[in-house]
Amino acid sequence: MRMRSDPHETTVPGERPAASYLDGQLLVAMPGMTDERFARSVIYLCAHSAEGAMGIIVNKPAADLNMPDLLVQLDIIRQDDAIRLPIRVGHMPVLMGGPVESSRGFVLHSPDFHIDQSTLLIDDGICLTATVEILRAIAAGTGPRDAVLALGYAGWQAGQLESEIQANGWLHCPADPDLIFNTALDAKYDRALRAIGIEPAMLSTSAGHA
């Protein structure tokens, strides 16, 4: 897995990285985030270990791309068939999941859909599948009940995420499938903050981490 490296990431002197791993949780960017790619981001962490971390940004749309257009580009449907897609598929946003492998699709979805040797169950309510088969199923109306598609992912090298958290770059909280799948993109950031117990208007760059 290729990981990103950002200049603002440094370990705070005298502090140790967080001991626990956060896969299956949400990362919520602090206002002081200096990397514009991650400003006001809500990221679902798919994997986190001593080797690094990988997550999907779940609240930023991909520029000038929707699900019907993507399905046509991938030759999953013909242009003429786009109007016949299930309504919820036609309105499904395509997200900017992160700067790593930004041409590759990743689908976070409910656990009612599974592809052997391709679907990763991250927690009880959220799975990850990154094959074209799930897009074919979604287009046919036989895919998961809930799903979001993202292009690319955010990655961290060993110890990098822990350092960012210690430096007050991120808050974190348990993931809520309803926030990920059923909340408007522009409402996810504030909802995630409130889930932590923080009123967005009161948050400052000097706030501590959860």
UniProtKB/Swiss-Prot annotation:
Cross-referenced InterPro entries: AlgH-like
GO annotation, cellular component aspect: cytosol
Pfam family, one: DUF179
SUPFAM superfamilies attached to this UniProt entry: VC0467-like (SSF143456)
Domain of life from the UniProt record: Bacteria
Family per record: Belongs to the UPF0301 (AlgH) family.
Protein name, per record: UPF0301 protein Mnod_6933
